[in-house]
Swiss-Prot record:
Keyword vocabulary terms for this entry: Aminoacyl-tRNA synthetase, ATP-binding, Cytoplasm, Ligase, Nucleotide-binding, Protein biosynthesis
Subcellular location: Cytoplasm
Protein's name according to its UniProt entry: Proline--tRNA ligase
Homology family: Belongs to the class-II aminoacyl-tRNA synthetase family. ProS type 2 subfamily.
Protein source organism: Bradyrhizobium sp. (strain ORS 278)
Subunit record text: Homodimer.
Gene that encodes it: proS
EC number in record: 6.1.1.15
A GO BP entry: prolyl-tRNA aminoacylation
Length: 444
């Protein structure tokens, strides 16, 4: 993509309404535009990041055996009355009526709808286990939306729902999602720490929030420092095998949100030098809720003996749009964003330091074509902006690889390459940087 043809409305000043780094940088970098309190338009740069995050979430859900579908944003109020949650959910639910006076709501979550879909089609234990998920926009009318996408009213969420014949099967489904979430966040450059948490309006008696430690987070958390060093399961993990050892390794060390924190247990189990009390960002949460929805909504299947059995369920959410903000909170410096490669809007940016110069123009054009031919998602800054402005833009938007093409380096057959993550610089031939980035694209 040529920057001269890309829509990138960068702000020169820090927006006054932005209280935290991620909100400020997302607005400054032209990723978002606020349309109303807690409601944002995702502009091209931000939308590219959002789609990269969504794809990682999708790949890890598929790897764990979940099946993707798509449910509508609008739901019938009667479904929520059937489960008993319509009145209990409170003012966060956006309730509307259509022209025929039918009561609808803009879905804040989908337990009722997915249970209704399940009971309409699944009649036998032979069709179990089943895990269905979708990635869809949600709306919760937060009383005080703030911090940009970290606490918006409209947000993109991955929500999965498992159905099993009994509690043992449901806990196996829970464990699969537990492991899938560890891998999902690690691929984005984050350490999502599973912490015991309250179940809230979703219900049930088992839940873990996945927390990214950050001082700007809204959740108070307590954990054993050693949990930060636990290994992430590899891509070859066998989801059909016994995942219990992985779960035990991660849950044997103390980690809890402030809602369920046990101070006496924390002090008894964790040596003083390993106690961590800080804040964090919730990027996902998983629940086992048994028969909370299947019982009132009569989601039954015929068991092995022919008798009807009430299924056991769980739900598993990832804040897809929130993750964009969480990654920035974890990956930035004073100059701007430092995107991990897997979620970066572009993998590399070519900076023409003498726009209009015949040699630099020709070298940039050739480099641009060569990188595209290798499948590298590259941005070419072919604008008339001065070199200092190009450097500032590249740092602000956080492209992992910056390739600087200037007359001096070209005279030696080289370009200067800077990695945004650590600021390291290296002189390379154009062919070498194409080979390096092309090899990375092939590997991924």
């Amino acid at each position: 993509m040529r920057l001269s043809r890309f829509f990138l409305p960068i702000l020169k000043e820090n927006p006054k309404e932005a209280e935290i780094v991620s909100h400020r940088l997302m607005l400054r970098a032209g990723m978002l535009r606020q349309e109303a309190a807690g409601i944002y338009a995702w502009l091209p740069l931000g939308f590219k990041v959002l789609k990269k995050i969504e794809q990682i979430v999708r790949e890890e859900q598929n790897r764990a055996g979940a099946l993707e579908l798509l449910m509508p944003t609008l739901q019938l109020a009667d479904l929520w009355r059937e489960s008993g949650r319509y009145d209990a959910y409170g003012p966060e639910m956006l309730r509307i009526s259509d022209r025929h006076k039918r009561e609808l709501l803009y879905g804040p979550t989908n337990e009722e709808m997915i249970t209704e879909i399940f009971r309409a089609y699944v009649k036998s234990y032979r069709n179990l286990p089943l895990n269905l998920y979708h990635i869809q926009w949600k709306f919760r009318d937060e009383q005080r939306p703030r911090f940009g996408v970290m606490r918006g009213r409209e947000f993109l969420m991955k929500d999965a729902y498992s159905f099993d014949l009994d509690e043992a099967g449901a806990r196996r489904a829970y464990n699969k999602m537990f492991v899938a979430y560890l891998r999902t966040f690690a691929r984005m450059g984050l350490k999502g720490i599973p912490m015991r948490a309250e179940t809230g309006p979703i219900g049930g008696d088992l839940s873990h929030e996945f927390i990214v430690l950050a001082e700007t987070g809204e959740s108070g958390v307590y954990c054993d420092r050693n949990v930060l060093d636990l290994p992430i399961p590899s891509a070859s993990v066998d989801y059909d095998g016994d995942l219990t050892p992985i779960i035990k390794e991660w849950t044997s060390l103390y980690a809890a949100t402030e809602d369920v924190h046990d101070g006496a247990r924390f002090e008894a189990e964790v040596p003083a030098e390993r106690r961590v009390h800080t804040r964090g960002i919730e990027v996902g949460q998983i629940f086992y809720f048994g028969t909370k929805y299947s019982e009132p909504m009569k989601a039954l299947v015929a068991g092995p003996d022919g008798a009807e059995v009430t299924i056991h369920g769980g739900s598993y959410g990832v804040g897809v749009s929130r993750l964009a903000g969480a990654i920035i909170e974890a990956c930035h410096d004073d100059a701007g964003i430092k995107w991990p490669e897997e979620v970066a809007p572009f993998r590399a940016v070519i900076l023409n330091l003498k726009q209009g110069g015949s040699d630099t123009d020709a070298a940039c054009e050739q480099l641009y074509r060569d990188l595209l031919a290798k499948g590298v998602d590259v941005l070419y800054d072919d604008t008339e902006q001065r070199a200092g402005g190009k450097f500032a833009t590249a740092d602000l938007i956080g492209i992992p690889w910056q390739i600087m093409v200037g007359p001096k380096s070209l005279a030696e057959g080289k370009v200067e390459v800077k990695t945004r993550s650590d600021g390291a610089r290296e002189m390379m031939s154009p062919a070498d940087i194409v080979a390096r980035l092309g090899a990375g694209t092939a590997a991924s």
